[in-house]
Amino acid sequence: MVDKLTHLKQLEAESIHIIREVAAEFDNPVMLYSIGKDSAVMLHLARKAFFPGKLPFPVMHVDTQWKFQEMYSFRDKMVEEMGLELITHVNPEGVAQGINPFTHGSSKHTDIMKTQGLKQALDKHGFDAAFGGARRDEEKSRAKERVYSFRDSKHRWDPKNQRPELWNVYNGKVNKGESIRVFPLSNWTELDIWQYIYLEGIPIVPLYFAAEREVIEKNGTLIMIDDERILEHLSEEEKARIVKKKVRFRTLGCYPLTGAVESEAETLTDIIQEMLLTRTSERQGRVIDHDGAGSMEDKKRQGYF
């Protein structure tokens, strides 16, 4: 008698299969590591896929220099504990221009420090495949993206020119200069991610758990006061509105562009219970998703994750 796989075990098996396929098919793959919960699950699956050996590819963090301080600490801790080969890349042109989310806005900051930074890093190291932790339930443009997302020589995505994917058969053929972005977590939901983290004991950034934190409400979004730089861009009236609230983050990005949510969820079981009851998108707090200068699909067409 064959035991039936649970829902999460089926997702796990599918993701591990995808990761192994890419490692076998491509010459120089890399795993993008954004330090968030999805990256944590994807990294855990990759380590399972090749256990007891080490990962046959490096992990890479495209650093905007505006992540939460706890994210940087967590990244360095994981790299040391897991013995990972970490590549970090910061767009030197963006640094020279002093690009930041306050002065230049979310759209320009994201394009230069994230999109252009990623393209620079992929070109510099000659990677022909890059794993990402995006899921189809996150956002509508991601919902129609294939597991193997093909990019042209300029890293652009054409949603009208995607290859069919039948069952678990993936076509990895690319021409010179082309590459793919691979999304092993495509069929996972936010609830799946949290349940898997709970069952597997996967470490995550403490920012996901509710705690008293200093925040300021800007345009309906609770922005955390993570370091002194944000204070330079607040008026005296805004500084007077800084308060402490019990909040957590459902998604993590650049801290001035990532909103917190009020919550009492201090444990993984609390978070799972919250997920069962919530009716709002996890990306409601991501400022770039509401940027009038361009939709997520437009950003992906230009080479975004």
Curated annotation (Swiss-Prot):
GO terms for biological process: hydrogen sulfide biosynthetic process; sulfate assimilation. Keywords: ATP-binding, Nucleotide-binding, Nucleotidyltransferase, Transferase. Pfam families: PAPS_reduct. The keyword Nucleotidyltransferase applies. InterPro entries: PAPS_reduct_dom, Rossmann-like_a/b/a_fold, SO4_adenylTrfase_ssu, Sulfate_adenylyltrnsfr_sub2. One of its GO terms (molecular function) is sulfate adenylyltransferase (ATP) activity. Pathway: Sulfur metabolism; hydrogen sulfide biosynthesis; sulfite from sulfate: step 1/3. Its EC number is 2.7.7.4. It catalyses: sulfate + ATP + H(+) = adenosine 5'-phosphosulfate + diphosphate. NCBIfam families: CysD, PRK05253.1, PRK12563.1. With CysN forms the ATP sulfurylase (ATPS) that catalyzes the adenylation of sulfate producing adenosine 5'-phosphosulfate (APS) and diphosphate, the first enzymatic step in sulfur assimilation pathway. APS synthesis involves the formation of a high-energy phosphoric-sulfuric acid anhydride bond driven by GTP hydrolysis by CysN coupled to ATP hydrolysis by CysD. Belongs to the PAPS reductase family. CysD subfamily. Heterodimer composed of CysD, the smaller subunit, and CysN. This is Sulfate adenylyltransferase subunit 2.
